[in-house]
């Protein structure tokens, strides 16, 4: 086969198994291996399917027609078993010390300690009496340091394995709990219960927009009027994955977010750049009866 044909084979394998275009170095490397007879297309596929990159996106074999909530739960359980520190905080997984220190940093950044955001979060409330919810808490990296600020912290996670690991850290902390949820709603919580909700590096892994939208709708139900929801989604970054998975999830543009906010009785009081991977938003729930929300 000529070089162009080999390049196309390598490119096709990258797109199918790694969900991205090949970088120049990778393309040259695998074309050279095929030209010299060291690998063929089958062994190239095997190489990709055994790579850490592929296993993050596809940690376990699942039937194509598996419901998305079951798929998310199974795949995140497997990721937690592989390396829970890495899949929670990829850039802070070299040591447990770095991992937990990063949680303190992220806690302060989310709350905006020393800024107007923090004042808006605790407005007219005593922090020691506030109920706070984290969506997608993992093993409690951010939840645990935040419990020093607020009266009661609840973290939910779709992965029973993450919950099992996390409960070891919160067992003796009376105002902090980690519970498993179904990954698609907040049905275990009553209306108007929380004083603040937040989520970080969670919605970016969800493979369907309707699930993210459902979570936002559910937050508008469980959050008290005039309280805040601080969260992050994946913006419309240039390096969009070729295949949406439970690792490389959906992206949102600003106009979509504004429509979702309006439909769920939220006012956007902070908005980051929707072209960033970490597209941050702060919503405030308007103080009208929840039954007045636009039904979707």
Predicted regions and their residues:
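Substrate/cofactor-recognition hotspot
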Residues: 1-61
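Helix-turn-helix-type domain boundary/helix-start signal
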Residues: 16-20, 187, 250
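Class I (Rossmann-like) S-adenosyl-L-methionine-dependent methyltransferase catalytic domain
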Residues: 62-133, 138-186, 209-210, 228-296
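Active-site acidic short loop of glycosyltransferases
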Residues: 173, 191-192, 225
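A short acidic, Gly/Pro-enriched loop at the edge of an enzyme's catalytic core
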Residues: 187-197
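A short SAM/SAH-binding and catalytic strip from SAM-dependent methyltransferases
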Residues: 196-210
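A short glycine-rich, Lys/Arg-flanked "PGG" loop and its adjoining helix->strand segment in the class I
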Residues: 213-225
């Amino acid at each position: 086969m000529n070089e162009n044909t080999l390049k196309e084979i390598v490119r096709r394998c990258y797109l199918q198994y790694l969900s991205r275009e090949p970088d120049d170095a990778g393309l040259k490397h695998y074309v050279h291996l095929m030209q010299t007879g060291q690998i063929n297309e089958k062994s190239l596929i095997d190489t990709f399917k055994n790579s850490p990159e592929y296993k993050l996106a596809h940690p376990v074999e699942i039937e194509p027609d598996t419901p998305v909530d079951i798929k998310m739960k199974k795949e995140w359980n497997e990721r937690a078993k592989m390396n829970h520190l890495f899949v929670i905080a990829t850039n802070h997984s070299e040591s447990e010390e770095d991992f937990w220190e990063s949680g303190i940093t992220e806690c302060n950044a989310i709350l905006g300690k020393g800024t107007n955001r923090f004042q808006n979060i605790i407005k007219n409330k005593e922090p020691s009496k506030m109920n706070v919810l984290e969506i997608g808490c993992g093993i409690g990296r951010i939840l645990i340091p935040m419990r020093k600020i607020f009266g009661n912290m609840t973290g939910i996670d779709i992965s029973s394995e993450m919950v099992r690991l996390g409960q070891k850290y919160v067992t003796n902390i009376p105002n902090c709990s980690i519970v498993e949820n179904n990954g698609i709603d907040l049905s275990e919580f009553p209306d108007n219960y929380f004083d603040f909700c937040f989520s970080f590096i969670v919605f970016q892994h969800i493979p369907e927009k309707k699930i993210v939208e459902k979570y936002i709708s559910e937050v508008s139900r469980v959050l008290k009027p005039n309280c805040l929801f601080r969260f992050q989604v994946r913006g419309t970054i240039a390096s969009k994955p070729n295949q949406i998975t439970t690792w490389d999830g959906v992206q949102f543009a600003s106009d979509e977010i504004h429509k979702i906010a309006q439909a769920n009785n939220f006012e956007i009081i902070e908005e980051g750049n929707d072209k960033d991977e970490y597209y941050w938003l702060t919503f405030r729930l308007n103080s009208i009866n929840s039954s007045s929300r636009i039904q979707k």
